[in-house]
Amino acid sequence: MAAGFFQAEMSILSSTLARSYSLPIRKTLMTFDFRIAMQRNPCLRIRRSCVAAFSSTPSHSRNFPIRGLEDVFVGYLFGRKKATEVAHVVWEQVIQKGDTVIDATCGNGNDTLAMLKMVMHDSVGCGGYVYAMDIQKDAIESTSSLLDQAVGSKEKECVKLFNLCHSKMGEIVPENARVRMVAFNLGYLPGGNKSIITLSDTTLSALKAAERILKPGGLISLVVYIGHPGGREELEVVEAFGSGLPVSDWICCKFQMLNRPLAPVLVFMFKREN
């Protein structure tokens, strides 16, 4: 049996997910327990087969609706993948070449680099832009250093770095920019000063800014770390914000381990293309 189970709370389950596990769609906040899925899906029920599936076979089986998510999701279910890896695969389903995206808490730069690779045109180098910001100067320097090591100077020009609080994102993006995604890692800088953390009030301001600038078909992605003082309160703010978004325009969900209370929580808010 897996070390932890997910609980996904959704304002509306997508039709593809509902079809995959034969679940009803309800216009209410509902709980999706993957223990039910494990009973209904042979791959999830047999751990040995699952491990073989995500370690040696190509992703996107005929029975799984989202390309690439099967491997990383089952890996996360069995403790072999990180929450950020799940987030990255979800991003790949949304971000297109040439898009404008925002890394609202760039930290050590790993998310920024992943976004850059998703928005760059292979033939022309740039095309898209990543606006990366962090309130800590050390984080900006770490991100810049990682980019220097990983990409060329031309590609690095596609990243705009800002030593600012994430609540200021509306001030750094050009007025005519259509933002495809805004991503957050909420908590403290890995390897940095643990007393410097993201705060509930500034995170709420940042979410409101993201809601305003995000284009239809865009995504707000959050990995919320809750093992530090203030982390759970910040998660509650994120949950309240997502729960308050209109169902007609947004699909909001949360993935959380049930028996690991300090594990990071994944939250996705997808803006519908009406």
From Swiss-Prot:
- GO biological processes: methylation; tRNA processing
Residues annotated for S-adenosyl-L-methionine binding in this entry: N108, N110, D134, Q136, H166
Task: Indicate the residues annotated as transit peptide.
Answer: 1-50
Provide the E.C. number(s) assigned to this enzyme.
2.1.1.61
Output one GO MF annotation. mRNA binding
| Keywords for this protein | Chloroplast, Methyltransferase, Plastid, S-adenosyl-L-methionine, Transferase, Transit peptide, tRNA processing
Q: What class of enzyme is it?
A: transferase
Q: What does this protein do?
A: Involved in the biosynthesis of 5-methylaminomethyl-2-thiouridine (mnm(5)s(2)U) at the wobble position (U34) in tRNA. Catalyzes the transfer of a methyl group from S-adenosyl-L-methionine to nm(5)s(2)U34 to form mnm(5)s(2)U34.
Where is this protein found? Plastid, Chloroplast
Top-level taxon:
Eukaryota
Catalyzed reaction equations: 5-aminomethyl-2-thiouridine(34) in tRNA + S-adenosyl-L-methionine = 5-methylaminomethyl-2-thiouridine(34) in tRNA + S-adenosyl-L-homocysteine + H(+)
What do the Gene Ontology cellular component annotations say?
Answer: chloroplast
Pathway stated in the Swiss-Prot or TrEMBL entry: tRNA modification
Organism lineage string: Eukaryota, Viridiplantae, Streptophyta, Embryophyta, Tracheophyta
This protein's name: tRNA (mnm(5)s(2)U34)-methyltransferase, chloroplastic
The family database entries (InterPro entries) matched by this protein are listed as:
MnmM_MeTrfase, SAM-dependent_MTases_sf
Sequence similarity: Belongs to the methyltransferase superfamily. MnmM family.
